[in-house]
Structures are given as C-alpha cells and as structure tokens.
C-alpha cells in the first residue's frame, strides 16, 4: 500500500498510487489509436494519456449522435479559489448550468466530461468539454456564455476559454469526429491527474447510452 505525505497543508497520494489508482491504471503512451474505423492522433501521446477518460468522452459523443444528427463540442477551463478534497463545486456548477439552459431549451440534450488536475499550484483546476445537441440550441456561444455566467456567479472567478473553443460533429462525418477527438484528448493527458484523496475522482462524465436502432459508429 502506497503511503501519503503532507505538503502545503494538502494530502497527496504518492506516485505509486497515481500510477495504479482506480482512474489511472489505463495510462497509454501511444501516439494514436483506432476507434471504430477512425484513427485518432494524440498530440504528445508519448507523455501518457488516460484511456478511460478518452473513451468516456468519445462514447458520449457517439451516444448523443445516435439520437441527434449533430453536436457541438465546447471547451471550457476553470480555476477555483482554494484547494478542496472533493469535486462538490463541479456538481453544483453542472446542475445550475443545465437548469439554466433548459429554462430556454427544455428538451436540450447536454453531455459533458470534466477532469480535475493539479500540478505546481496549491489548488486544483478543471477542464471541461460540453457535448450539446446542436439541433436544439441556436449556437455554441449560447452554451459557452451560460457556462461563463454560471461559473462566475458560483466562484467570482472568470473562467478561461481556450482558442477555438467550438467544434461541430455530424453523424457519419468521420473527419469532424476525428478533429473533435484530437482536441478533447487534451483532457485525457495523464499529467496532473491523481493528486487528490483516494475517494475523489479525477474525472466525471455524463451517462448517455447509445440508441441501438441508430448506431452512430463511423
């Protein structure tokens, strides 16, 4: 059993736990992999990436594409004011954001994946990819604007929006799927993962299921 040590008033699991912990036991170092008929390139893949995180994201894209013809992928990053041992703030943020959007778009299908990371800073930060039914919102910016406002109200911190935060993936369009997958792969990088209490998750994802009658596999 790996031990733990105290550093800057926070508890961190040792590297042994990071490598073999529940969310880090499928670390790959391949620069690409096959998903259905698609070859997905992983930028800096040789540095390590988490297979379960990557496949959770791709599975959610596919699941939504089995019930709608196209989805927006929207990237969003956020910091918190101080370290916390759990991800409770993310749960509150997610609930409030979805509630806010569904007031205007009641039937909106809203998928997501988020990851928790911590490197040299004293507190963790988060990366998000929202996977949203593009048939039921007028634009991706509507979702991003709502996310920014929700996060600011919750934390009083302005989030970071990466360059080119929007992607659109169309059912049956292999190239759009590959491009979005390669962008989302940033969330799956192993660096920064694992620095958290054992019971706390490194990532979370929505749980949409594939509609069997309309399999979207490319």
Language-model segments: residues:
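Histidine-centered divalent-metal-coordination microenvironment in nucleic-acid enzymes
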Residues: 112-135
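Catalytic "initiation/cleavage/transfer" segments centered on a nucleophilic residue
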Residues: 18-68, 134-218
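Residues that flank catalytic or metal-binding motifs in active/ligand-binding sites
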Residues: 72, 124, 183
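Signature for HUH/AEP ssDNA processing cores
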Residues: 59-119
């Amino acid at each position: 059993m790996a031990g733990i040590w105290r550093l800057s008033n926070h508890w961190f699991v040792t590297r042994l736990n990071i490598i073999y912990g529940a969310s880090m036991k499928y670390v790959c170092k391949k620069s690409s992999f096959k998903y259905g008929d698609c070859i997905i390139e992983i930028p800096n893949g040789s540095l390590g990436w988490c297979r379960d995180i990557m496949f959770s994201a791709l599975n959610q894209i596919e699941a939504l594409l089995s019930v709608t013809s196209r989805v927006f992928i929207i990237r969003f990053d956020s910091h918190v004011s101080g370290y916390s041992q759990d991800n409770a703030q993310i749960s509150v943020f997610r609930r409030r954001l979805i509630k806010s959007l569904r007031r205007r778009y009641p039937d909106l299908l809203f998928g997501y994946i988020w990851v928790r990371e911590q490197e040299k800073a004293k507190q963790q930060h988060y990366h998000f990819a929202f996977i949203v039914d593009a048939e039921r919102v007028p634009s991706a910016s509507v979702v991003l604007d709502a996310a920014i406002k929700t996060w600011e109200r919750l934390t009083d911190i302005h989030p970071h929006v990466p360059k080119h935060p929007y992607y659109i993936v169309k059912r049956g369009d292999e190239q759009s799927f590959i491009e979005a997958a390669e962008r989302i792969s940033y969330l799956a990088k192993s660096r920064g993962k694992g620095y958290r209490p054992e019971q706390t998750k490194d990532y979370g994802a929505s749980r949409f299921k594939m509609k069997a009658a309309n399999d979207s596999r490319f």
